[in-house]
Amino acid sequence: MAAMLGRDEDPVGALSGRVSLASTSHRSLVGASKSFRDVFMPQTDEVFGRSERREEDDMELRWAAIERLPTFDRLRKGMLPQTSANGKIELEDIDLTRLEPKDKKHLMEMILSFVEEDNEKFLRDLRERTDRVGIEVPKIEVRYENISVEGDVRSASRALPTLFNVTLNTLESILGFFHLLPSKRKKIQILKDISGIVKPSRMTLLLGPPSSGKTTLLQALAGKLDDTLQMSGRITYCGHEFREFVPQKTCAYISQHDLHFGEMTVREILDFSGRCLGVGSRYQLMSELSRREKEEGIKPDPKIDAFMKSIAISGQETSLVTDYVLKILGLDICADILAGDVMRRGISGGQKKRLTTGEMLVGPARALFMDEISTGLDSSTTFQICKFMRQLVHISDVTMIISLLQPAPETFELFDDIILLSEGQIVYQGPRDNVLEFFEYFGFQCPERKGVADFLQEVTSKKDQEQYWNKREQPYNYVSVSDFSSGFSTFHTGQKLTSEFRVPYDKAKTHSAALVTQKYGISNWELFKACFDREWLLMKRNSFVYVFKTVQITIMSLITMTVYLRTEMHVGTVRDGQKFYGAMFFSLINVMFNGLAELAFTVMRLPVFYKQRDFLFYPPWAFALPAWLLKIPLSLIESGIWIGLTYYTIGFAPSAARFFRQLLAYFCVNQMALSLFRFLGAIGRTEVISNSIGTFTLLIVFTLGGFIIAKDDIRPWMTWAYYMSPMMYGQTAIVMNEFLDERWSSPNYDTRINAKTVGEVLLKSRGFFTEPYWFWICIVALLGFSLLFNLFYILALMYLNPLGNSKATVVEEGKDKQKGENRGTEGSVVELNSSSNKGPKRGMVLPFQPLSLAFNNVNYYVDMPSEMKAQGVEGDRLQLLRDVGGAFRPGILTALVGVSGAGKTTLMDVLAGRKTGGYIEGSISISGYPKNQTTFARVSGYCEQNDIHSPHVTVYESLIYSAWLRLSTDIDIKTRELFVEEVMELVELKPLRNSIVGLPGVDGLSTEQRKRLTIAVELVANPSIIFMDEPTSGLDARAAAIVMRTVRNTVDTGRTVVCTIHQPSIDIFESFDELLLMKRGGQVIYAGSLGHHSQKLVEYFEAVEGVPKINDGYNPATWMLDVTTPSMESQMSLDFAQIFSNSSLYRRNQELIKDLSTPPPGSKDVYFKTKYAQSFSTQTKACFWKQYWSYWRHPQYNAIRFLMTVVIGVLFGLIFWQIGTKTENEQDLNNFFGAMYAAVLFLGALNAATVQPAIAIERTVFYREKAAGMYSAIPYAISQVAVEIMYNTIQTGVYTLILYSMIGCNWTMAKFLWFYYYMLTSFIYFTLYGMMLMALTPNYQIAGICMSFFLSLWNLFSGFLIPRPQIPIWWRWYYWATPVAWTLYGLITSQVGDKDSMVHISGIGDIDLKTLLKEGFGFEHDFLPVVAVVHIAWILLFLFVFAYGIKFLNFQRR
């Protein structure tokens, strides 16, 4: 909610016009002439007068006592009426800083009786109070002069993000940076030399078709333009340029994209926002207001006084502002429900859109720029919100621009001014009343039953313009946007605007509270506390993850202590120390790896952070520090669990001092790891890149830690990297703590090593320090790394921006582009013309069976949310649908309408069989036969509200893929392709055929383009019954009209189509044949025909006593929703659901349901010989085809994979340079073993980690496609694995060539092929392992935790840390159950297992290499064929589990 008060330090400081948009009670400000009794006490007989006067005197005394308080205390005290035990209303003193929820609720009930009616009066009371004492309200006038914005794009096929293009584009960018190659990017102009004035106290509507530049204009005015765009021109606020104030705090930009933490409730999100944005100058205002009222003897209304004082108190965890915003945005009903996300059930899309609006309204900004705030909202809700905005603008003198896609006529009438934007040019800017006159000036007229807003968005379109030509005596000629724009300057409104520009704004008139000069709304300490509280809340909501991590490290410590049991751990010799080395290294790995989950959490929270950072909610350090500080206790707990369980059971040095030193070392390592992963997450910014960078960093850190390869064996040119590795300091600290203990002080008899004791020999053999003070140096170094990584984390948050963008790409070039556009235009014109009243265009009708759908007494329940139980709501189930009945018939277009939260999508999900949880009751029949979901999926289509598509394929490929799998086998390829082309033409997708779909809000298609693709994907399936959930949501009026014409054409072919729809215009609403209207609570209140011009609908509701008549020209859809709101029901004491159930219309509806629930004579139930439209092999082929193109165009995944492969190969080659040529002593063999271990484990782990985010994105698409009956899970699994194997094969080839040559292995064909084979199969099973875990867990965060747990086990039992013969007998079986152990067996044995050389072993002497491998490690060369076969078995096992997981597990909650 906007601030009610001004923004400056000036005590007179000015009332900001934006208080809550909530209403007040019917009494307001009370002047000196009224007493408190006049406000609250009813008039009574004289017999009670004396006692009432005593009460009044008491009230006056208490108010006087408040006025005598010091200013600081006085502004925190208020008086609120309370009902006493005897039923009397009494004023009670109350501390406004400690308002309980019941107090806020009580005040809300007094101020807000009916929001729709009382809001204006409430705002006037607030304004009157400040006007009465002469406090001036600040105003902001925004001017933009000659603004042009342009951006760079790549042209033609080079814009597609294939691996080849990304490589080429990267090389070009590097060469271009050094001016060695001219840039091949093209400039596109988004805004073209536009100028205008946005005035306070006038609400401005911004209209324009998609890609017209609306969002760019709003972002430019708000000072939030993308850094990659170039802007010229001048923008001023009250004559001041951006450098003179802080635009992000002076104004508020409300984005199209709904980014919120799904773990927080609606109220918590708004409270946090209000807390960070601050109160502006409300406190100074209240101080001055209170002083002036005291001087003039004015006693304010206690309710108004309490409200204004409460919202003026800074630093509150929760504010009344939140309660008011919840009320006026209609979010009070879901205030305590989680926002939700992709995998977590939460509020609806419309409610989330309102939450995005509310998040900025709770702040004190004086100018508001709102970008498409009505997406997903019904027309009634949009109207109410815009009405509140209008009251705010007019009463409080706020500056406001609102961009809307499909404003209904009544909503359009609320605006004062219009800015019409098209092709980056302003066609019209000025009063709404003159806009039709302007177009009549050009010869165009708006039809009678056409919304003006719809007309304005279509009249500039070449495809739609001609139908509005009104000068019949003159031939029509297309009037271009440039012609309109230039003609506006000669129109009287344009001339007036030009004359206003000639007079510069007088800076001296700028109110001191108008422009904000402080960067943040509250103090640094308050910002830190707010972020700290939120971080603690998020940790509690994600407690499962932290509990899971704790359980994981507990289990792992129990396993470790049984592997390295102290009875098996001997002390005193060098060979005994080797086993302790393995135990300490593994412990270090686990404590460090347990912090890997921090990387996923960081990436997950970045989108919300970037939004709030750019809006100046808080500085980056305030976001980063709580995440660091709150993890310190967790580090202590995890380190304590590990040390407590393993230290003495393994048999480390027994003294208490060394125990606590070891605990300190592990704690520091864990803190360093958490800090490192947070930093890497902020650097990577996406799951794939972060996982790649994270795994690569771990590889370097671990390899150079001193255990895998000794320091003395590292080449001199890599020594610096050894000292840069944090792992080295952790490893040094723990091994020094152990081996400098007295029990390792046996004298050393090996003269080749200059050391006095066995402990020093163990340290020096691997290059560790032996001086005791190095332990503390290492501790300080680890803490220093932790501080450094946290500092880098803050810097990354401060300076890096999110990856990905939504810029357009030029798909065609030159003449080809023009031809393509012409073809698309001509086809569309033909379609639009042919879909007129002369008769529908049926086009190519593929064979299908017309089907009806009837349902009755449908009830749907979900388990009661814990948040609602916490609020005192009783019951175990929450009912969302209540006795819903209806029928959908072939050739009949049915609208499913209701306010947000009425249950429209819920009903559609139930009918379509898309619900994955909850409890369903009732009957559903298809053409008289009980619905069978398997066959129903074959004959139905479902256009979901959320446009879910594979992001890395093109539009054409998406449609071909859908048609390929869903059309029957008797339709040949040519017919199928022609049908796809026709559908693309119907939905106007031909110009976008080669565009990448992309991720919503990140890249690729815009919202409206994505919506049209969703519809086309279902239409190409040729379904008999089509469900469309909000098909026009997010579309402008013209795009919505195109979509609805497509829908109408579909219905005219005899199909059954039902659409939920939020905000239909008159012509769209009246294109429907029948209506099913629902009210909040999931009850039907109308089901029947609309009639001509909605006559039957209007007659039905007007016949209800008390319902106001519809006005001429009013949208029947909006009127219908307005008169059936809960507040109207309450006012008229009606229940529309009860009225409907007692009506003749209900009885006719029941008769229809009964008829359609009975099979017609001679009919047969829908039956298919096979479950799926295509055969198993075709499904596999089609899925592989899509996955092939998806992977080819996913450079973030595959380009990074190959880059990391090359970098890791080269680095390992340098670290282990020619290590394979030396097998003279035990350390040489350990180094080679370490090289093979690192080469397999780390790149394999990288594959397993990076594949999971890619699988997570595709899994969401898989859920939709599986529900649509496109394919079985097995072909999908096989195809995805096949594509991965293809890339793994190439990856292994690159890696093997680099590594094999640099580490110095023998160049024989057999050994090279064995090396390649084991590397390839290991990379495949690692990748499949990551895919398998993704299929078995709800999200990739949990999958990542599970992966780190099992990788730790694989690491422990790989045979490197503890050879198989030394593993206790009770754990030896798990060695054979560890894939990495088999790979190391194969690699080591194939490379050196056939050598006859001798190896020197300390304390033993020379021994034959084959004997050493057999007795020391359990390796035999003759066992290689078995090892090779087992690798295939691992691959098949993981493939089977992956397929099983995606087939039987569904983590989507609907």
Curated annotation (Swiss-Prot):
GO biological process, one term: xenobiotic transport
InterPro entries: AAA+_ATPase (IPR003593), ABC2_TM (IPR013525), ABC_trans_N (IPR029481), ABC_transporter-like_ATP-bd (IPR003439), ABCG_dom (IPR043926), ABCG_PDR_2 (IPR034003), P-loop_NTPase (IPR027417), PDR_assoc (IPR013581)
Residues noted as binding ATP 2 in the record, renumbered to the chain: G898, V899, S900, G901, A902, G903, K904, T905
Domain of life (superkingdom): Eukaryota
One cellular component term from this protein's GO annotations in UniProt: plasma membrane
Domain spans labelled ABC transporter: 175-448, 853-1106
Entry keywords, A to Z: ATP-binding, Membrane, Nucleotide-binding, Repeat, Transmembrane, Transmembrane helix, Transport
ABC transmembrane type-2 domain boundaries: 526-739, 1178-1392
Cross-referenced CDD domains: ABCG_PDR_domain2
SUPFAM superfamilies: P-loop containing nucleoside triphosphate hydrolases
Parts of the chain that traverse the membrane: 544-564, 584-604, 623-643, 663-683, 689-709, 716-736, 775-795, 1199-1219, 1231-1251, 1285-1303, 1312-1332, 1342-1362, 1367-1387, 1423-1443
Biased composition (Basic and acidic residues): 812-824
Main localisation: membrane
UniProt key word ATP-binding: yes
Localization per Swiss-Prot or TrEMBL: Membrane
Binding site for ATP 1: G208, P209, P210, S211, S212, G213, K214, T215
Family: Belongs to the ABC transporter superfamily. ABCG family. PDR (TC 3.A.1.205) subfamily.
PANTHER family, sorted: ATP-BINDING CASSETTE TRANSPORTER (PTHR19241)
Protein name per UniProt: ABC transporter G family member 39
Species per Swiss-Prot/TrEMBL record: Arabidopsis thaliana
Organism lineage string: Eukaryota, Viridiplantae, Streptophyta, Embryophyta, Tracheophyta
Gene from which this protein is expressed: ABCG39
